[in-house]
Amino acid sequence: MTTKFHTIGLIGKPHHPGTNQTLKRLHHWLTMQGYEVLVEERVATELGPHIVAVDLLEIGERCDLAIVVGGDGNMLGAARVLARFEVGVIGVNRGNLGFLTDLPPDAFEEALAKVLDGEFDTEHRFLLEAEVYRHGQLKASNTAVNEAVLHPGKIAHMIEFEVYIDNQFMYSQRADGMIVSTPTGSTAYALSAGGAILTPNLQALILVPMFPHTLSCRPIVVDACSTIKMVVSPENGENLEVSCDGHVHLAVLPGDEIIVRRSSEQLRLIHPKGHNYFHVLRSKLGWGSKLF
């Protein structure tokens, strides 16, 4: 990879001391090397004067690379917006797990310098589009990087719904909800609910029922081009919703139909050269660690 970057956007978690410190270091380090640096307006005021503050959309439009400082939640929030542009996205971990944020906050310079010099790997992660229909009319929609989840608004309350794959009836469910996850999200909420890990290059979705009231129901993997339809029973209560990455919530009423399909948008995720997904699984999740 020989692509060079010229304009770089900085994105971070507002009012977070560790993030603020890393953003200041990044801004100074990048400007000293001659890069044009744009800072998301939510954090720009915390970095002092002489900062070019823009919104997230302008970062997507003008930047070659966006650096997200924070945890996976910050990365997901930025990714849902930036995926509609061609901008590459890389993360500096200032969160807990940091599954999508590769660079260490206290020693990012060496790895980032190589990335900026064109030594990096690129992954394209597809997103989901979630839509809520009521009496045939679209009522709400949004995108998700990790997962779209149908669930009740109150804890420990079962709901009833039917699931269709490409308009073919699959099954009826009585459960706490349903997770429809991308490969990116298969190491997140879907994993906690008992779903399989899908490697990022798979063109697939995984459907994971949440606490189904049955002894036989298991997660299922389907083609990424499939259209998932969930029809909510009219007998359910009214406090239902679809959550996209746990950040955006779409209201659902009894009788509504939820359509989840692959979005046309893709996140262009940048990794340092030699990025190893299985090493990330071992180091972040303690997966399959060597015994000797």
Curated annotation (Swiss-Prot):
One Gene Ontology biological process: NADP biosynthetic process
Keyword field contains NADP: yes
Catalytic residues (positions): D72
Cleavable signal peptide: none
Origin superkingdom: Bacteria
PANTHER family for this protein: NAD KINASE
Name this polypeptide is given: NAD kinase
Gene: nadK
